[in-house]
């Protein structure tokens, strides 16, 4: 796979096709642009390795999905309009970009995007809550607090390093329905029936907000881009490009 940059920007990704990319694929948390290798067959596309993932260096500070969108918008100045394909975290970025910079976006194809702000199923364990309080008072050291975060945090949080922990915290504290209502381009949502990180109910709710959206449910599929979900995403992308 050939690596290429997005224009003269530092954004790098896997290049598909020989023409100027009119598809920009944005991967999920902890993943890379290589997730889209089969989805993008037959297209002119760039599957980015977002900063902090794959072969890309981490951002200089804890970027929110909106920050990723702002930097991508700068990189797309002078570029043709693109169809954004967003999976999970990449879909968060795609929605922010389409809402804030509609002139840059032709259409959206989304899958497995956590559209609703995550709420804790239960309170954090008492020792962790006490530790957070102690840290806020300056009683507990940051190194000790980090040990407790590793013990009590989610798998994604434990696996994230350095600034990427801040990126994760920023992302899970957001929802996207207000932005969805501002997006006037066609939106195709392709969802696994049993997606747990981004439940189908969130996508169904989003239909009330996106002005021009359709939802394709893939029976038996979960969140990872594999099997029938991967195939249906490729079909949806080609349909969007040929619309």
PLM regions and their residue ranges:
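Catalytic histidine-centered segment of alpha/beta-hydrolase-like enzymes
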Residues: 221-232
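Alpha/beta-hydrolase fold catalytic core
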Residues: 1-23, 40-44, 77, 106, ...
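Short beta-strand/loop motif that positions the catalytic acidic residue
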Residues: 183, 189-191, 195
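Flexible "cap/lid" loop of the alpha/beta hydrolase fold
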Residues: 95-100, 104-137
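Gly/Ala-rich beta-loop-alpha elbow adjacent to hydrolase catalytic centers
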Residues: 86-90, 94
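Active-site loop/oxyanion-hole signature of alpha/beta-hydrolase fold enzymes
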Residues: 9, 47-85, 235
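Conserved HGGG/HGGXW glycine-rich cap/lid loop of the alpha/beta-hydrolase fold
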Residues: 14-57
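Conserved alpha/beta-hydrolase catalytic His-Asp/Glu region
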Residues: 132-185
């Amino acid at each position: 796979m050939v690596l290429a940059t997005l224009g003269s920007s530092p954004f790098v990704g896997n290049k598909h096709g020989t023409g100027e990319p009119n598809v920009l694929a944005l991967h999920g948390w902890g993943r890379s642009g290589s997730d889209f290798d089969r989805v993008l067959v037959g297209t002119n596309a760039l599957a980015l390795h977002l900063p902090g993932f794959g072969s890309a260096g981490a951002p200089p500070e804890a970027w929110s999905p909106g920050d990723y969108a702002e930097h991508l918008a700068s990189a797309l100045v002078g570029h043709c309009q693109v169809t954004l394909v967003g999976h999970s975290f990449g879909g968060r970025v795609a929605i922010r970009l389409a809402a804030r910079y509609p002139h840059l976006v032709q259409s959206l194809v989304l899958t497995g995007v956590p559209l609703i702000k995550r709420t804790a199923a239960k309170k954090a364990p008492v020792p962790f809550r006490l530790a957070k309080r102690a840290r806020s008072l300056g009683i507990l050291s940051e190194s000790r607090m980090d040990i407790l975060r590793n013990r009590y945090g989610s798998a994604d949080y434990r696996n994230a390093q350095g600034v990427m922990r801040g990126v994760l915290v920023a992302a899970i504290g957001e929802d996207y329905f207000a932005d969805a209502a501002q997006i006037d381009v066609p939106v195709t949502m392709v969802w696994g029936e049993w997606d747990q990180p981004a439940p189908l109910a969130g996508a169904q709710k989003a239909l009330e907000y996106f002005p021009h959206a359709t939802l394709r449910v893939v029976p038996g599929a979960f969140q990872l881009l594999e099997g029938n979900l991967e195939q249906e995403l490729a079909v949806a992308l080609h349909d969007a490009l040929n619309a």
